[in-house]
Structures are given as C-alpha cells and as structure tokens.
Design a protein with these regions (language model features):
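Glycine- and small/polar-enriched repetitive beta-structure motifs of secreted/surface proteins
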Residues: 1-199
Length: 199
C-alpha cells in the first residue's frame, strides 16, 4: 500500500495494493484492496469495496462496499455507497447515485441525480441530469434527456434531444431538439433536427 497525505489510508489492516494520495483519502478502508484514491477525501468512507478508482475531491467519497467503480472529477459518484460497476467522469457526474449499477456518465453533472437507476449511459453536459430510478436510457449530447426522471429505455442523440421527457419510455430521438417537447408519451421515433419537436 502507498499512502501520502494526512490521515490517508489510516485504517487499512489487511487490504492490499491500495494507493491513497490526499488528505483523508481511503482513510476508513480496512480490507478493501486494489483501490486508487487521489484527492481530498476521495474514497474516504470506503471500508471493503474493491477495486475502485477515484480521482478528485470527494470522488467516491461515501463509497463503503461498492466495487468496480471509476470516478474522475470533483464529487464524481460522491454519494455512491454500495453500487458496483459505475463510471463517472466530470464534475458532479453521478453525484447523487447511491445504489445504481452499471451506469456510465461523461460530462459535467451527467446523470447527476441518479440514485438507483441501472444501465444508463449519459454523455454530455447535463445529459440525463434528473434521472433518478429509470433504467437503460442512452443520452448523447448536451441536455439530452435532461428532465427524464423515471422514463426507461429511451435513446436520445443530439443536443436537447428528448430534453423535456420525464416519464415517457421506449422513445428514440436522433437529432438536435428531436422530440424536444415530449414529456410522458411512449414509443415515438423522431429522426432529424427538431423532428416531432412539439409532440
């Protein structure tokens, strides 16, 4: 194990191959192994979770037993506790996530409010920002599916595509502002800039 910084890795007992750099980085870890924490309080609450990578202030800071997570950015996956297999890159990306598994978020506040939703992909500033419990959504583009809360299995590609959608499911929007006004309707397909924008 390698620990650099005040209180970094102070509780490690049998955990192996950990790297903790920064004040209180990995400071609660006991048996967790193969973790990398770089930044103030990164992976600070981790006890047995393995393997995780956290780079940034409080990245994966609340994680206790979750494993296979990667968080890069200020507060990325900051509230994750037990969830596995998430990747969050960007400031506040997936910050509220607690138990959602197998999600990928790339961009400032992407999937920010996700708590228990699984298998979502968000790429872009505020993509899927309000998603909480919904599963299997794909959003690519700034503010794509940004208002979505519980709508599932939607695909939005393009800036503000399906950006007003809240509970609608099984929609496909390809193009800037495609299906932009849709909120609760299901099973729509829109291809092209502003296609079905008023739907």
């Amino acid at each position: 194990n390698v620990a650099i910084g005040d209180e970094a890795g102070t509780a490690i007992t049998t955990g192996d191959n950990n790297v903790a750099i920064g004040y209180t980085a990995l400071d609660a870890n006991t048996t967790g192994a193969n973790n990398t924490a770089v930044g103030y309080a990164s992976l600070g609450a981790n006890t047995t979770g393995t393997p995780n990578t956290a780079v940034g202030r409080s990245a994966l800071g609340a994680n206790t037993t979750g494993g296979g997570n990667t968080a890069v950015g200020d507060l990325a996956l900051g509230n994750n506790t037990t969830a596995d297999g998430n990747t969050a890159v960007g400031r506040n990306s997936m910050n509220v996530n607690t138990e959602g598994h197998s999600n990928s978020a790339l961009g400032d506040t992407a999937l920010y409010r996700n708590t228990t939703g699984d298998s979502n992909t968000a790429v872009g500033f505020q993509a899927l920002d309000h998603n909480t419990t919904a599963d299997s959504n794909t959003a690519v583009g700034a503010s794509a599916l940004t208002a979505n809360t519980t709508g599932a299995t939607n695909v939005a590609v393009g800036d503000t595509a399906l950006d007003a959608n809240t509970t609608g499911s099984h929609n496909v929007a390809l193009g800037v502002s495609a299906l932009g006004a849709n909120t609760t309707a299901d099973d729509n397909v829109a291809v092209g800039r502003s296609a079905l924008a008023a739907n």
